[in-house]
């Protein structure tokens, strides 16, 4: 898991409960048990693609099961997907957010992994009230993201072939693995 996210959660006095990983993602039996026994669960944090530090990608079956468990227990999901565009082969699995019909998934992505690590620019998609609270949390960390980094990301996305750029990155990383 991303240490920055974990530290943000801790700053709000969150009780973090680790869930073991299987070869195809989070252990759903352990998650279900935690959801049944832990009190006041607010959300499930997951990195479904190339989970840090294991590198495991959650299977499609487990993505659907995670969503169903969250829905059944009235819990939101924070889907952190900084590495999702950097797959080596085949097609990427759909995000959990892509089948969210109930508005319970917050999707977070990053340009830091695909444009420049030093820029530290990310984004989130989710319910407006939750995004407003996330903005307050972000402001407590660094007031706001550097405006020039945001402008550079915007210009890169609008003036270059971003899909071709991602394909080039995948070729480079495939050779290095």
Where do the protein language model's features map onto the residues?
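Short beta-strand->loop structural element characteristic of the AMP-binding/adenylate-forming
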Residues: 15-23
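Substrate-binding/gating loop at the entrance of the active-site cleft, primarily
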Residues: 1-14
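Helix C-cap/helix->beta junction micro-motif
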Residues: 12, 72-73, 103
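Active-site phosphate-binding strand-loop segment of PLP-dependent enzymes
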Residues: 24-88
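Short, intrinsically disordered, charge-balanced linker/junction segments flanking boundaries
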Residues: 16, 169-177
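Hydrophobic residues at beta-strand termini and immediately following loops
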Residues: 19, 96, 108
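Conserved core segment of the aminotransferase class I/II
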Residues: 101-171
């Amino acid at each position: 898991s991303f240490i920055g996210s974990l530290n943000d959660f801790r700053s709000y006095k969150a009780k973090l409960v680790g869930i073991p990983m299987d070869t195809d993602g989070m252990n759903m039996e352990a998650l279900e048990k935690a959801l049944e026994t832990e009190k006041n669960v607010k959300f499930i944090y997951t990195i479904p693609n190339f989970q840090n530090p294991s590198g495991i990608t959650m299977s499609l079956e487990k993505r659907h099961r995670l969503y169903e468990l969250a829905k059944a227990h009235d819990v939101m999901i924070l889907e952190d997907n900084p590495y999702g565009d950097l797959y080596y082969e085949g097609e990427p699995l759909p995000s959990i957010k892509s089948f969210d019909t109930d508005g319970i998934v917050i999707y977070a992505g990053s340009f830091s992994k695909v444009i420049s690590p030093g820029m530290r620019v990310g984004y989130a998609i989710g319910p407006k009230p939750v995004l407003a609270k996330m903005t307050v949390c972000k402001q407590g960390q660094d007031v706001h993201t550097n405006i020039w980094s945001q402008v550079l990301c915007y210009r890169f996305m609008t003036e270059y072939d971003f899909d071709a750029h991602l394909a080039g990155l995948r070729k480079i990383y495939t050779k290095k693995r």
